Every structure is written in structure tokens, then in C-alpha cells.
Amino acid sequence: MHFETVIGLEVHVELKTDSKMFSPSPAHFGAEPNSNTNVIDLAYPGVLPVVNRRAVDWAMRASMALNMDIATNSKFDRKNYFYPDNPKAYQISQFDQPIGENGYIDIEVDGETKRIGITRLHMEEDAGKSTHKDGYSLVDLNRQGTPLIEIVSEPDIRSPKEAYAYLEKLRSIIQYTGVSDCKMEEGSLRCDANISLRPYGQEEFGTKTELKNLNSFNYVRKGLEYEEKRQEEELLNGGTIGQETRRFDESTGKTILMRVKEGSDDYRYFPEPDIVPLYVDEEWKECVRQTIPELPDERKAKYVNDLGLPEYDAHVLTLTKEMSDFFEGAIEKGADVKLTSNWLMGGVNEYLNKNQVELQDTKLTPENLAGMIKLIEDGTMSSKIAKKVFPELAENGGDAKQIMEDKGLVQISDEATLTKFVTEALDNNPQSVEDYKNGKGKAMGFLVGQIMKASKGQANPQKVNQILKQELDKR
């Protein structure tokens, strides 16, 4: 028997507002524990929540960017549960009347475009954070009340690979809107996954399992891959799948049972009596619509149609707004479009991955990268020298030409000096000279390599090729 995988994702995104969802406390990451709190966050008796207008605007902006319908009438509800980092013993959320519904995004997997539906986007407040250490539980309520949006996909995803592509695209769109930085390491983007299997051809869904502790997109994919395999083996062996919540264990790559899954009835939702229903008229919707910036698909089309970049380059460059903005800044400073694209996808990305840093954590700027690329363009700097200059540029900033001179890496373009290197290479490799005369094209490349090696990569490659051909023709 063959099974079809059915996946739905629930993504929590922390909105980048100055204050919290229902209180005036600052909503900033990294503050001293319990320093960004007030009587509303601490649930003192008699205090009343006040809705953050900016958070509503940004929830609407995100909804529109995800092709959703904005509800004219929506409301807030109480989701009741007890936990130490939830002082009210309920969370203010939206249950049956969310702010956004019926959206979608298009993803690309293996060269094919697929549309993934989005059921809803609703607003809610975050809980605090519990830390367990040395037999004690510590509670930090700085995060309590931080504005969140939860984006719930339709069960349209059919593989862990599609889930990964969906998350990448969703993060990209939200980042471009400016409502969140979507940093998983800081908790501003979190994902829970629901997965079930059903026999091919069956319309009814199988029993779903919820996965938690998915702290990176890679862990989402790995957790789903493991769960897909686990459920298939269980079903093939005649077993059944229970509706449960499981935790992904990063060290083993397996999922571990946490608890039997609750239903919505367990939370005893009811309308929030302290907040009036939300009414959004057409004028308000239009005001928000006017604030939506250029989104990744628009930029990608621009890069392909206007700048002549390949589809792949355009896709990679627009995955994050930070990289896309950097690319546009560099070409505005006069850098060649394709060379800039190659460097950002190649040398820059390799440096970021190797050092586990973000672009903003380096000393790179569109100006200094463009300066280096222009030196490569005009022949002042070879690609080999650029690879030696680049790490210094990324770590300390400055001017690429000055770094090249300080390191003694100035490209050799003097004809007499280059002719000497060429002559030595020809004298030391007579067989390659003979091979060249016999029409073996690889011989030329070998000789160029010998010359570059002898010059420690500093010979001007264009002039080397020119002089080498002249000298070979003389022999």
C-alpha cells in the first residue's frame, strides 16, 4: 500500500511593534528579565487591555501580502489554559472571526509552481518564557503580551520539501512587508507542523500528529521526514496513529511523544468581554493597502525582465529582503549586475555560512563590495586576488584597492614582467607547447595555470592570455 502525505503548517510571527498587543510596555528582544512589564502584563485585578492600532495595521498588511480577504468584522477571544508564564490563565487570541482569511502563496519545487492555500491569519498575544535550571523554574514575562500573528496553511502540502519551500516563501514575504524580521533564533518566527498519511486516492484525512520544537526550517524538514517514515511503518504493520503532540529531538533526529493532543474545546474559548469587536471599513483597508511595499515576486520579475538575470539568480537574491536590498545598493553604485549576483550567491554566502553570521553582522556595504567588483571589471584585480581581499573587506570594511595594496597583492600588468613568466612556463613545459601546436586546447589552460602559479595569482589573466598566444605562435 502506498500513502500520500498531508501537511499543514501553523506559523507564529512576532510583530515588530514598539509596544505590546494590549499594554504600553516595550516589546523589544534582549532586555533584562521582567523589565519590560507593567500591571496589564502581570494580570493585576481590574486592569483593562487596549488594542495596539499598529499591530492591527500590520496584521492587515501581512494578510494582504498573502492574498487574504480582510474581515470587516472580527473579534478577540479568551483561550483558557494554566501555565506559569501565562499570569492571566488565559491568552487573548482570535477564535472564529480572524482578521484575515482565504489567502495563498505560490511556491516552486523541482521547477514546478504550486499554490498553497492559507486558511486564516489571526492576531494574539505571546506568552512569557519559562526556563528550567537546577531544579528551579524561572519565568520571564518580557515576552508576555508581545503582538503575534498566527498564519495557518491549508493541508495542501504534500512533502517535507514542499513544507520547507513554503516556509522560505512565507518568511520572505513577511520580511518584505516590514512587519517582522522573522528571526527564528530570537523567537520572532516559530512553526508547528501537522502531518498525517492516507492511502492514495482516499479523500478522508488520516489522524494528524502535531510536531513542536522545530527551531529551524531544516528541523521542520527533518522532523517531518522522520514522522512521515514513522507513521508509514506503523500503518504498514497494522497499527494506528493517535492524535498527539510530539517533540522533535535535535540530537537524535527523532520525534518524541509529549502529550495527547487537545482539541479547541479543551481551551474553552469565549469572546473577550473587555475588548469591543473590531470593525474595519474600506477606508482603513485602503490606507493599509497603500503601505504594502514591493514584494519578492515583483522583485524577482524585475531582476529577470529588466536586469537580465537568470531565474535561479533572481530567486536566490530575493529570498531575503536584506540580500535583495544589498544587491540593488551595489548595482546602484555601478557594479556589474551579473558579477554582483555571482559574488552574493558565491563568495558572500560562503563567508556568511562559514562564519555563521548575517550580512548585517559584517563590515560589508553595497559601496565597498561594488568598489571591489569594479576593480575586477576593469582588470585592476583578478578574481583570485579578490578572493584574498574579500575576507578582510568583510571583517574590517575599508577600500578593496587599499587592502590589495597593503597585502602586496597588486595585479601584475607590466608586459615585460608577464613575458618573462610566459617564457619560463613555455621553456619548462615543452610537451604542452607541442600539444598546443597539435590542436589540444587544454594545453593553453595548463600553461595559463602555471603562469598564475608562478606569479602567485597576481598576473593579469587577460594580458597573460594575450602574451601567451603571441609567444606560442612564435614557436
Curated annotation (Swiss-Prot):
Heterotrimer of A, B and C subunits. Gene3D superfamilies: 1.10.10.410, GatB domain, N-terminal subdomain (1.10.150.380). GO terms for biological process: glutaminyl-tRNAGln biosynthesis via transamidation; translation. SUPFAM superfamilies: GatB/YqeY motif, Glutamine synthetase/guanido kinase. InterPro entries: Asn/Gln-tRNA_amidoTrfase_suB/E, Asn/Gln-tRNA_Trfase_suB/E_cat, Asn/Gln_amidotransferase, Asn/Gln_tRNA_amidoTrase-B-like, GatB, GatB_C_1, GatB_Yqey_C_2, Gln-tRNA_amidoTrfase_suB_CS. Keywords: ATP-binding, Ligase, Nucleotide-binding, Protein biosynthesis. Belongs to the GatB/GatE family. GatB subfamily. HAMAP family: GatB (MF_00121). The lineage of its organism: Bacteria, Bacillati, Bacillota, Bacilli, Bacillales. The keyword ATP-binding applies. Transmembrane segments: none annotated. It comes from the Bacteria. Allows the formation of correctly charged Asn-tRNA(Asn) or Gln-tRNA(Gln) through the transamidation of misacylated Asp-tRNA(Asn) or Glu-tRNA(Gln) in organisms which lack either or both of asparaginyl-tRNA or glutaminyl-tRNA synthetases. The reaction takes place in the presence of glutamine and ATP through an activated phospho-Asp-tRNA(Asn) or phospho-Glu-tRNA(Gln). Its EC number is 6.3.5.-. This is Aspartyl/glutamyl-tRNA(Asn/Gln) amidotransferase subunit B. It catalyses: L-glutamyl-tRNA(Gln) + L-glutamine + ATP + H2O = L-glutaminyl-tRNA(Gln) + L-glutamate + ADP + phosphate + H(+); L-aspartyl-tRNA(Asn) + L-glutamine + ATP + H2O = L-asparaginyl-tRNA(Asn) + L-glutamate + ADP + phosphate + 2 H(+). The keyword Acetylation does not apply. It is an enzyme of class 6 (ligase). One of its GO terms (molecular function) is glutaminyl-tRNA synthase (glutamine-hydrolyzing) activity.
